[in-house]
From Swiss-Prot:
One of its GO terms (molecular function) is kinase activity. SUPFAM superfamilies: Ribokinase-like. This is Guanosine-inosine kinase. It is an enzyme of class 2 (transferase). GO terms for biological process: GMP salvage; IMP salvage; purine ribonucleoside salvage. Catalyzes the phosphorylation of guanosine and inosine to GMP and IMP, respectively. Can also use deoxyguanosine. Shows a strong preference for guanosine. dATP, GTP and dGTP can serve as phosphate donors. It comes from Exiguobacterium acetylicum. Gene3D superfamilies: 3.40.1190.20. Induction: Specifically transcribed in the early exponential growth phase. The lineage of its organism: Bacteria, Bacillati, Bacillota, Bacilli, Bacillales. Manganese or cobalt, but not calcium, nickel or zinc can replace Mg(2+) but results in reduced reaction rates. Pathway: Purine metabolism; IMP biosynthesis via salvage pathway; IMP from inosine: step 1/1; Purine metabolism; GMP biosynthesis via salvage pathway.
Length: 303
């Protein structure tokens, strides 16, 4: 069983899904649901359900909701001993508005206390990284945290993989990607980071290669219905993996689930192509459900 440390934020997601096409100047009748989310938390859940030994490093608020977040993660098998409980602002909230096709149209994000989260991660990472096989980190954290984890992983010779919860920090500090083993992003994120346009699969491979030259040697770009591409400059290989069309119920968490499956396979020394294939399967299961991530009931469909 692989041991993977996951570092990132916890959010409580509030999703409103319209029953009909959205109209910004009218009342939209629909459904509203509450669920636990956040890129770091989602990745921790996905990796645990896939059978990895997960150590989650984060903060939650010391209230009923925060306790519920931890209980849910523990039920999936994740270790939450390195999650610190704060009296206030230990986690964020995400308000999402989905259209009747299940696609995200707009959102508002309330962030957890950045300084307290940073302090907790710096404290806990000293102990939590001992004995792990790999580290996954949400890139929507402070530069101080990212630099510290890059330093620790280099010192401990641990592979470090980054996933974009939000692009703002890494967009302003693109040089930090040089400290990562692997980086996975969407087509839109890749276009912003590379200042290049992606229309075809060939475009995506070119952009992934340009990003890999300046950043993580293993770079993946996801392209929704066109699948995903990868470039691995360590082995001078690249490729494309397609995906099957699925009915979208809720696209939230699809990127996190794809990232998790790819990382899970890579830490088991599977090939990049095998990793991306599982990533596509897992993402498809999540997209076709109302879940933010993989749950045990979905595992049979991955066989």
């Amino acid at each position: 069983m692989n041991k993977i440390a996951v570092i990132g934020k916890v959010f409580v997601d509030i999703k409103g899904t319209s029953f009909a096409p959205l109209h910004k100047d009218a009342k939209n009748v629909g459904d509203i649901t509450f669920s636990n989310g956040g890129t770091g938390r989602n990745v921790a859940q996905n990796l645990a359900v896939l059978g990895n030994e997960v150590r989650f490093i984060s903060t939650v608020t010391n209230d009923q909701i925060g306790v519920g977040v931890l209980d849910e993660l523990k039920s999936y098998g994740a270790n939450v001993d390195h999650v610190e409980m704060l009296e206030d602002h230990g986690m964020g909230m995400w308000l999402a508005v989905m259209d009747n096709e299940g696609d995200l149209q707009t959102s508002i994000s309330k962030q957890p206390d950045a300084k307290l989260l940073e302090e907790a991660i710096l404290r806990q990472s000293i102990y939590a990284l001992d004995g792990v096989d790999a580290v996954a980190i949400d890139l929507d954290l402070s530069v101080t945290v990212l630099e510290r984890l890059i330093h620790l992983c280099r010192k401990m010779e641990l592979p470090l993989f980054g996933v974009c919860g939000h692009l703002s920090v890494i967009e302003r500090n693109r040089h930090l990607l040089q400290g990562f083993t692997g980086f996975i992003c969407s087509r839109e994120e890749a276009e912003i980071l590379s200042d290049l346009s992606i229309v075809t699969v060939e475009d995506a491979i070119h952009v992934a290669n340009e990003l890999a030259k300046k950043g993580a040697p293993f770079t993946v770009v996801t392209m929704s219905e066109l699948g995903a591409v990868y470039v691995d400059r360590r082995t001078a290989t690249s490729g494309h993996v397609g995906t099957k069309k699925v009915k979208v119920v809720d696209s939230t968490g699809a990127g996190d689930s794809f990232f998790s499956a790819v990382l899970s396979e890579l830490t088991q020394e599977k090939s990049a192509e095998e990793a991306l294939k599982l990533g596509m399967k897992v993402a498809a299961e999540v997209i076709a459900s109302t879940e933010n991530g993989l749950v045990p009931e979905m595992l049979d469909a991955l066989q």
